[in-house]
């Protein structure tokens, strides 16, 4: 599959909001809450990137917002459609390019990932993120891994140095 990475548009975000699993509970309890929460997350982000397939359909979003207590650290988030279940290497490569670009703005990217999301943790580890041992996240009370990536620790090239199209 061929993908193109560009800054996300409102149409990309709207499409992904509609494509979200209404039973996931991650972004709210119903489709309206999912869309509202995704829109708020995008609005607070300094960068939001979209991957589109060769038909121009959005299939992934990545974003980063400054951490509230340290604006040099970016709180990274991502959302991907099911097609990447069969194409994990493509998603890993796309993610690496986007995260490298984000590290041009932030000295570190981090977030907390629920321990039950083993595939997400392994994806982030494979890109170069450090995965800390599981601990209870104080804000949510959920057992999470802190995942983080420092600017000097990326194996990927920036979007400016690589083609934004992945074959």
Q: What spans do the regions from the language model cover?
A:
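Conserved beta-hairpin
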Residues: 45-64
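Conserved acetyl-CoA-binding loop-helix of GNAT-fold acetyltransferases
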Residues: 87-101, 122, 126
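Conserved catalytic-core motifs of GNAT/GCN5-like acyltransferases
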Residues: 112, 130-145
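Charged interaction scaffolds used for protein-protein
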Residues: 45, 52-53, 153-156, 165-167
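Active-site rim helix/loop that mediates acceptor-substrate recognition in acyltransferases
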Residues: 28-47
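Conserved beta-strand-loop-alpha-helix junction that forms the acyl-donor binding cleft
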Residues: 109-125, 137-139
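Conserved acetyl-CoA binding element of GNAT-fold acetyltransferases
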Residues: 71-85
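A short beta-loop-alpha structural element at the N-terminal edge
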Residues: 1-18
């Amino acid at each position: 599959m061929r993908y193109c990475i560009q800054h996300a548009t409102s149409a990309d975000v709207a499409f992904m909001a509609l494509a979200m699993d209404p039973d996931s509970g991650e972004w709210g309890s119903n489709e309206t809450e999912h869309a509202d929460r995704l829109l708020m997350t995008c609005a607070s982000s300094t960068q939001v990137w979209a991957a589109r397939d060769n038909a121009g359909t959005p299939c992934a979003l990545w974003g980063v917002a400054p951490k509230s207590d340290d604006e040099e650290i970016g709180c990274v988030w991502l959302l991907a459609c099911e097609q990447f279940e069969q194409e994990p290497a493509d998603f890993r490569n796309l993610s690496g390019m986007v995260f490298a670009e984000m590290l041009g703005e932030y000295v570190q990217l981090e977030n907390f990932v629920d321990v039950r999301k083993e595939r997400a943790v392994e994806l982030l580890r494979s890109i170069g993120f450090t995965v800390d041992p599981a601990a209870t996240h104080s804000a949510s009370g959920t057992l999470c891994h802190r995942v983080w990536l420092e600017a000097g620790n990326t194996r990927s090239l920036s979007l400016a140095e690589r083609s934004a199209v992945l074959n």
